Amino acid sequence: MGCLGNSSKTAEDQGVDEKERREANKKIEKQLQKERLAYKATHRLLLLGAGESGKSTIVKQMRILHVNGSNPEEKKQKILDIRKNVKDAIVTIVSAMSTIIPPVPLANPENQFRSDYIKSIAPITDFEYSQEFFDHVKKLWDDEGVKACFERSNEYQLIDCAQYFLERIDSVSLVDYTPTDQDLLRCRVLTSGIFETRFQVDKVNFHMFDVGGQRDERRKWIQCFNDVTAIIYVAACSSYNMVIREDNNTNRLRESLDLFESIWNNRWLRTISIILFLNKQDMLAEKVLAGKSKIEDYFPEYANYTVPEDATPDAGEDPKVTRAKFFIRDLFLRISTATGDGKHYCYPHFTCAVDTENIRRVFNDCRDIIQRMHLKQYELL
């Protein structure tokens, strides 16, 4: 009997346990409330757009501007990716010389063995980037035939950073090469899956989600739609004369327009506004001024397009460039105004994702818009 009496808790002990439970529950509830408030205070931005539009470069800019950029170890890890970009670029160009119509011969026949060497190493995945490789690349890039083939790169699939890194082959080949911020911005690595970047601007928390833009990646987008503050849609304006990698047939800008329309009219996104980044303005200007690929050859309606009276060109901007960029802007705005129901809006901005100052300025301009969307999202406006 004595043993049974000792095993039961006194009323006083039970009271202490109950008090501890209540205090523990209070702490948990307080923490949950804190997390709920932090969640509500966070601006969630979803980056969407077709493949190779510049979404990942925008994320890199946010890291440079708001997360102290990349540390030395991260830069070191990117060296292999950058050298792979060089290899992919030169392999693609020399391989295309014989396949485009009409084909392009080497200007210097003595470079033939170099071209053969580059083609021979194309399938090697764990390639050792020797000085021999860099010497061959440098000589080939100096060949006028290779340059002529590069000028026709809209006829085949070439990464945007090809010229940038081929022109910097001397520094990229150095044993003690350290990538610059601009090198990191230019480096092309295929985005597969969903990547989240967190940063803070003036004590406001932002979560930016970058998802792959290729067709087979888009099924993953739906996972990111929950509680999104705003969509940043990135369109490569310079792609008006290019075709997508997936089928080598569909015009890239048409694909971007179709994708934008499907997002704009998506029933799950009818209340989420879109910030439209009309990207690659630097490359668009180069193409327009070069005059080799005319926009009207791909978009016949351009022939009758007139720049709106309220259009404001950049200082010193060529009128041909102004007309081209506003034409592309209006292609997207035509979609948003045709089916808009007043529940969401489209805010266009001209961007150059590799230009840090441009992205700083544009993102600062967007912050007020994002804040208004956030207040509306939680019915505070």
Swiss-Prot record:
Residues 10-25 have a biased composition (Basic and acidic residues). Residues 183-191 are annotated as: G2 motif. Keywords: Cell membrane, GTP-binding, Hydrolase, Lipoprotein, Magnesium, Membrane, Metal-binding, Nucleotide-binding, Palmitate, Phosphoprotein, Transducer. InterPro entries: Gprotein_alpha_S, Gprotein_alpha_su, GproteinA_insert, P-loop_NTPase. One of its GO terms (molecular function) is GTP binding. It catalyses: GTP + H2O = GDP + phosphate + H(+). A lipid is attached at residue 2 (N-palmitoyl glycine). It is found in: Cell membrane. Pfam families: G-alpha (PF00503). Residues 1-25 are annotated as: Disordered. Coiled coil: none annotated. GO terms for cellular component: acrosomal vesicle; apical cytoplasm; ciliary necklace; cilium; cytoplasm; heterotrimeric G-protein complex; plasma membrane; sperm midpiece. The modification Phosphothreonine is found at residue 178. Residues 206-215 are annotated as: G3 motif. CDD domains: G-alpha. It is a peripheral membrane protein. Its main location: membrane. Residues 41-381 form the G-alpha domain. Residues 275-282 are annotated as: G4 motif. A lipid is attached at residue 3 (S-palmitoyl cysteine). Mg(2+) binds at residues 56, 191, 210. Its EC number is 3.6.5.-. G proteins are composed of 3 units; alpha, beta and gamma. The alpha chain contains the guanine nucleotide binding site. Interacts with GAS2L2. Interacts (GDP-bound form) with RIC8B (via C-terminus); promoting GNAL folding and association with the plasma membrane. Belongs to the G-alpha family. G(s) subfamily. This is Guanine nucleotide-binding protein G(olf) subunit alpha. It comes from Rattus norvegicus. The lineage of its organism: Eukaryota, Metazoa, Chordata, Craniata, Vertebrata.
